[in-house]
């Protein structure tokens, strides 16, 4: 059941949700994570964008597990002003790819990540705009959860903002109050993963005051 701010979803400034069981990756949610899964730190450090996919289907049960991991993402005030569409049929995947120039390969399936405007536009204009802006960030965090879960399960993907939103909305029968934000192709990588180069930590991290790039002293 969706919780709204009036239901006090925060305790001491932290979001409270029902407890979830297991990692929910490629296994039943009532089971413990398989030992073969990589640890969380490795997943975080090795995930990279995957744009070329092997011609292999992804099991429906695994897709459902990935979606559960996606929905465990943080959401402001637990409003969950998001909605997602899964596209799995090969013909539909090809059509969606045709109107998504940012997608280079043909994935096993797509997730279209959207903001649910019916949960952002029912307040004062100023507050509705603020909640809408925040909800877009929540959708992005859900997509990151999806990508990390996919990587942990031996799959890969890439968030794509370059797509014909009007055509995709019409093609998938998406209602007017649902606004697509990202198209996310997911599949098994066709080639070995090559991590992208990142800026050095001392270029982007400041400690205690702006411009102080010295690492925090160890205890």
Curated annotation (Swiss-Prot):
Keywords: Cytoplasm, Flavoprotein, FMN, Oxidoreductase
Temperature and activity: Optimum temperature is 60 degrees Celsius. The activity increases quite linearly with temperature and is nearly twice as high at 60 degrees Celsius as compared to 30 degrees Celsius. Above 60 degrees Celsius, the enzyme activity dramatically decreases, probably due to thermal inactivation.
Post-translational note: The N-terminus is blocked.
Entries under InterPro entries matching the protein: Nitroreductase, Nitroreductase-like
Cofactor requirements of the protein: FMN
One GO cellular component, as annotated: cytoplasm
Superkingdom: Bacteria
A GO MF label: oxidoreductase activity, acting on the CH-CH group of donors, oxygen as acceptor
pH dependence of function: Optimum pH is 8.
Catalytic activity, reaction form: cyclo(L-phenylalanyl-L-leucyl) + 2 O2 = albonoursin + 2 H2O2
Entry's localization field: Cytoplasm
Main localization of the protein described in the UniProt heading: cytoplasm
Class of enzymatic activity (EC top level): oxidoreductase
UniProt xrefs under Gene3D superfamilies: NADH Oxidase
Pfam family, one: Nitroreductase
Annotated EC: 1.3.3.13
Subunit structure: Homomer.
Record family assignment: Belongs to the nitroreductase family.
Function, as annotated: Involved in the biosynthesis of albonoursin (cyclo[(alpha,beta-dehydro-Phe)-(alpha,beta-dehydro-Leu)]), an antibacterial peptide. Catalyzes the formation of alpha,beta-dehydro-Phe (DPhe) and alpha,beta-dehydro-Leu (DLeu) residues during the biosynthesis of albonoursin. The catalytic reaction of cyclo(L-Phe-L-Leu) occurs in a two-step sequential alpha-beta-dehydrogenation leading first to cyclo(alpha,beta-dehydro-Phe-L-Leu) and finally to albonoursin.
Protein name (record): Albonoursin synthase
Organism: Streptomyces noursei
């Amino acid at each position: 059941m969706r919780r709204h701010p009036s239901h006090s979803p925060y305790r001491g400034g932290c979001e409270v949700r029902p407890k979830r069981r297991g990692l929910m990756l490629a296994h039943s949610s009532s089971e413990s994570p398989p030992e073969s899964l990589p640890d969380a730190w490795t997943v975080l450090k090795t995930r990279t964008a995957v744009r070329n996919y092997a011609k292999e289907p992804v099991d429906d049960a695994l897709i459902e597990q990935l979606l559960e991991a996606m929905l465990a993402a943080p959401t402001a005030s637990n409003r969950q002003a998001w909605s997602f569409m899964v596209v799995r049929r090969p013909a539909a995947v090809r059509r969606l790819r045709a109107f998504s120039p940012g997608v280079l390969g043909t994935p096993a399936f797509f997730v279209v990540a959207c903001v649910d405007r019916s949960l952002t536009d029912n307040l004062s204009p100023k507050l509705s705009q603020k909640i809408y802006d925040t909800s877009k960030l929540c959708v992005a965090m859900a997509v990151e959860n999806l990508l990390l879960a996919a990587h942990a399960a031996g799959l890969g993907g890439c968030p794509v903002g370059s797509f014909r939103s009007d055509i995709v909305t019409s093609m998938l029968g998406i209602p007017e109050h649902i606004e697509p934000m990202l198209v996310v192709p997911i599949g098994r990588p066709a080639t070995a993963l090559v991590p992208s180069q990142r800026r050095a930590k001392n270029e982007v991290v400041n400690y205690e005051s702006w411009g102080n790039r010295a690492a925090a002293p160890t205890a």
